[in-house]
Amino acid sequence: MKKTLLVRSYKLILSTALLFFVFPVLAQDAENEEKPKLKLGGALRFNYNLSSWKDGQKDRGGDFGYDMFRVNAEGSYKRIFLNVEYRLYSEAFGGGFLKQGWMGYKINKEDQIQVGLTQVPFGLQQYNSHNWFFNLTYYVGLEDDHDMGIKYIHDSDRIQYQLAFFKNAEELQFGSTTETDPSRYSYDITGRNKEINQFNGKFIYKLGKDRQHQLGTSVQYGGIYNLDTKETGNHHGFALHYEYLGEKWNVKAQGMIIDHNLKTPDTI
């Protein structure tokens, strides 16, 4: 009986000691989550260019110059967070513009909502390429594309899916018939046409012990409003994609079908 009481006493003392040490740590973590956080970053990039089709440049051994300067800001307070990136390129590559800028709300550890200039969930992300020039998909608005809208993300151990609605591309002018401003990071359908009311869905299943194999599919459908005819066409796309995330290797593969139906003066 005495031994039993002694063991119980030891257990009680040990439990009390553990609570004494663990509780302040938990309280500290909770306190840190309540404090506003701000993370600032950026980059400065230069570029050496030697083009085989430019005789003058070949004669002088190429050119070395300024390429891009960027500023990043990430902030959070409780469940609200934001992400902003501004880039300033050389004049030949577009000058300055906002690459992304959105606010978000964390519903829980797996679910969140983003609102603003956020990345379109279509195909491999963030990039469908391994080089400075990106892939052809970037130049048709299907790689690292950012538009104005709202996006829901669920990301769990094995499954990730995203659902989004985008009102339009990055809009800097709000006239009745003004064209989409060229000061944008993303490639979009522009000129006398405007992307409107676009819906996106993306699903990824993670395979392997370390989830290094990611197999997914993406769908996209939206309107294309013509400023001259005041008619709305449409565009839609479907993609299958796979990515291997190894320690030293990264393999990407993607196939897609894209279609555009414009309502220009010569088509109606």
Question: Where do the PLM segments sit?
Answer:
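N-terminal signal peptide c-region/cleavage motif recognized by signal peptidases
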Residues: V22-P24
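Loop-centered beta-sheet repeat module
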Residues: E171-D228
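Detector for outer-membrane/organellar transmembrane beta-barrel domains
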Residues: Y205-I268
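Outer-membrane beta-barrel and related beta-rich outer-membrane complex signature
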Residues: K54, Y127-S129, Q173-T177, T229, ...
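Bacterial N-terminal signal peptides that target proteins for export
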Residues: K2-L14
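Outer membrane beta-barrel
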Residues: E33-W53, R60-E171, F203-K209
